[in-house]
Structures are given as structure tokens and as C-alpha cells.
Design a protein with these regions (language model features):
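Bacterial Sec-dependent N-terminal signal peptides
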Residues: 13-40, 200, 336, 384
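Intrinsic-disorder/low-complexity, polar/charged segments enriched in Ser/Thr/Lys/Arg/Asp/Glu/Gln
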Residues: 31-35, 104-106, 184-186, 197, ...
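Tryptophan-paired
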Residues: 49-138, 197-201, 205-337, 373-384
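Short, solvent-exposed beta-strand/turn "edge" segments of beta-rich domains on protein surfaces
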Residues: 188-193
């Protein structure tokens, strides 16, 4: 009974199986078929309202691994040969698709239904090649358990900006067939991106700021450094980004449309690993944050001149001072969602980074799809 894999519509280059020795249109001789269908409607670029970029929808490779309990199940392909530790698919072999047509979204994996029945199917999209190599039976440092796979994928980032496209996507499901001999058995797997996307929009409400004359600086700090296959709560490691200049003032594309007629800047989108520290204290488990260093010209006679150190030359009316702010992220970030923070700078910051003024913001949480993810309704929430 041949295992097949069916993807929902993908707004990216589709992939085909690289396993050989079987007929793309399906087996002959009356054998059954199993469809492995990815619940990946979030990869569909529905229309112009879609909030994911083509790069975020990209599917270059797919790897399917079967586990029985905690242990990897080596599967003997129908096409012959030794048992394999995983089934691998790529975007370049369209001839392996049903009817030689990738739009069918179905590809056959040469495995018997009876061999995979009762296992857990783990699907990994855009898996790093170094991890894939360790899935092979007999590989050096072979991955043989779920825990080992989790640790292998949980790579530590060197900087926040290391999380780039194509994005890792994962999903798993229990394989339960009432009758493995039945034609067209199907496995449904809900696949999600393993990370979320963060956008920060700055509103320069305070009239002493000069974003049209001199751009400020921002730094992503204390972000979680590990990406996990399954859901993750704790922040087990942290990483910082580089101090970077804020972009020029610019028009904002939907859904980042400005609501106030004030100068705005949008920080570059950044991908962030999920976490949940909502039940912990801020003193022991602080939330990640964005540090802002924004130039402001205070002017002569401003009471703030006694708080901020004199700028170069001592002229508060012509030379800007550095004003520091913090945008503290929510204490829970869930994978496969897009978080848009609208932060308003309504007054002076601090003259020092360690005492940076915390900005309030409105937070919009959107699934990376046009349909809802449970727990997120796409409405706006106030950070207080």
C-alpha cells in the first residue's frame, strides 16, 4: 500500500519526491494509497490581503519521519532497498508528481500502510540539510528519537537576524488506520511555521523629535535564541541584534496603515521564536524588547535641559540630544502568527539607555493566514 503526500495550494515553488523506483501515477496491481495531506492553507496567497510574503510561503524541501513512541521507525520502501529513516522531497523533480503535475499536490511515498500504522508522522518543511543527513539509518550521530530530533532542530542563533527565509515549518499527527488494506487511506497533518513575524511601527508624536532630519537607532535585545519542532514555553537562551539605523520615513503598506497624521517609521520585519513567560515574573524572566535611541532638539529654555546632558557645543536649539525608549514585547508569542506593534513616542525619553522610558503600544495579532488561529481574533489589544 503506497504512501502518498498531498499539499494544499502553495504560493511558492512546489516540490516533488526524490525517491525513485515507483510510478508517479500510482501503483499497479490493486494496491491501496495513503494520502498525507498537509493542513497548510496558511501557505496560500489568497489575494492582495495576504500578509505573508512569497519568501515566507516558500517550500523548498519536505521530510517525513515516522516514530513509534519515542523511537524512529525505519521503513522499507516498496521500491526495494534497505530501510530508510525518512522520506525526502524537493522542489525540482516534477516528474515524481501524480500525472507529472505538481498542481495535483500529491506525491507517492513508497511505503506500506501496515508499516506506518500506529506511528506518529512528523513533517518538516525546509529542514536544514545538516539535520536531514542525521535522519539516515546508520548516519554518523544518527537521530533515532523524538528528543534527539527536537534538540537537533533547536539550533542556537548567533544574532536575532539569523532567522531568515525559507522558514522551518513543522507538524505531526498520529497515524491510525481502521483498515490499512482499504484504498485511499489518508493522514492529515497540520503544518505551521516554527516561528512568528514581528513588525514594529514608530509614531513620532512628540514634536521635539526630528526623524525627518536625523534618523535614530534601534536594537533587538533579549530575544529567544532557540527554534523548536513542538510548542515551547520557556526562554532557554537569549540573543541580541545589532544596533541599526531606523529607516527613512515611509508610507506603510496594509495592514500597517498609519492611523494618525504624524511621521512614522517601520522597523524591518524580524522573525522570532515562540515563548510563553506569562506565568513568570518580569524580574527573573524579562520579556524581549526593542531599545530605541531617537534624536530630539529640545530648544532653549526647555526644562528638560537640566535633565539631558548638553549636546556637543552646548546648544540645545540646534544640536539634538539622545532620547532612549523601550518597546517591551508581549510575554507570550505563539508560532505562525504575525505581531504588529504600533508604538507612539508621545514625550521625552531617558538620557541613558539603562533608564529607557517604556513606550505604550497597540498590538495587532494576525494569523499568518486569512483564517483565524484559535485564540487570536485579529483585533487590536492595548499594552498597559
Amino acid at each position: 500500500h503506497t504512501l502518498t503526500s498531498a499539499l494544499l495550494t502553495v504560493a511558492a515553488t512546489l516540490f516533488g519526491a526524490c525517491n525513485k523506483g515507483y510510478v508517479p501515477d500510482g501503483p499497479t496491481g490493486g494496491e491501496g494509497k495513503i494520502k498525507l495531506q498537509f493542513g497548510a492553507s496558511d501557505l496560500v496567497q489568497h489575494d492582495t490581503r495576504g500578509i505573508a510574503t512569497p519568501a515566507e510561503n516558500t517550500v523548498n524541501t519536505v521530510d517525513v519521519v515516522f516514530f513509534r513512541g519515542q523511537n524512529k521507525e525505519a521503513i522499507t520502501p516498496n521500491s526495494g532497498g534497505a530501510p530508510v529513516g525518512s522520506f525526502h522531497f524537493e522542489a525540482t523533480t516534477v516528474g515524481d508528481w501524480v500525472n507529472n503535475d505538481p498542481t495535483t499536490q500529491t506525491v507517492y511515498i513508497p511505503a506500506k500502510a501496515s508499516d506506518v500504522n500506529g506511528t506518529t508522522a512528523v513533517t518538516l518543511i525546509n529542514l536544514p540539510a545538516s539535520v536531514r543527513a542525521r535522519l539516515a539509518v546508520g548516519a554518523t550521530d544518527e537521530i533515532t528519537t523524538v528528543d534527539q530530533l527536537t534538540k537537533a532542530v533547536s539550533q542556537t542563533l548567533a544574532t536575532v537576524e539569523d532567522l531568515t527565509t525559507p522558514l522551518l515549518m513543522t507538524g505531526q499527527t498520529n497515524v491510525t488506520f481502521t483498515n490499512p488494506a482499504t484504498q485511499d487511506n489518508k493522514i492529515d497533518v497540520n503544518v505551521k511555521r516554527a516561528v512568528s513575524r514581528l513588525d514594529v511601527v514608530l509614531y513620532y508624536d512628540w514634536d521635539k523629535l526630528i526623524p525627518n532630519q536625523q534618523r535614530g537607532l534601534y536594537t533587538f535585545l533579549q530575544f529567544p535564541s532557540k527554534t523548536f519542532v513542538g510548542a515551547n514555553a520557556d526562554i532557554t537562551g537569549r540573543v541580541d541584534g545589532a544596533k541599526t539605523q531606523v529607516a527613512d520615513l515611509t508610507a506603510q503598506p496594509a495592514p500597517l496603515t498609519a492611523t494618525d497624521p504624524v511621521p512614522t517609521s517601520e522597523l524591518p520585519s524580524v522573525y522570532i521564536n515562540e515563548y510563553d513567560i506569562s506565568a513568570k515574573t518580569a524580574s527573573t524572566d524579562p520579556a524581549p524588547y526593542v531599545l530605541l535611541e531617537l534624536p530630539a532638539i529640545l530648544g532653549d529654555g526647555n526644562p528638560l535641559n537640566g535633565i539631558f546632558p548638553p549636546p556637543a557645543g552646548g546648544d540645545f536649539s540646534t544640536t539634538p540630544v539622545k532620547s532612549y525608549y523601550k518597546v517591551i514585547l508581549p510575554r507570550k508569542i505563539e508560532r505562525n502568527c504575525r505581531y504588529v506593534l504600533h508604538a507612539h513616542v508621545v514625550g521625552p525619553g531617558s538620557p541613558t539607555a539603562d533608564q529607557a522610558v517604556v513606550l505604550q503600544f497597540t498590538l495587532t495579532v494576525r494569523p499568518w493566514i486569512e483564517t483565524n488561529v484559535p485564540g487570536f481574533d485579529g483585533t487590536t489589544h492595548e499594552n498597559i
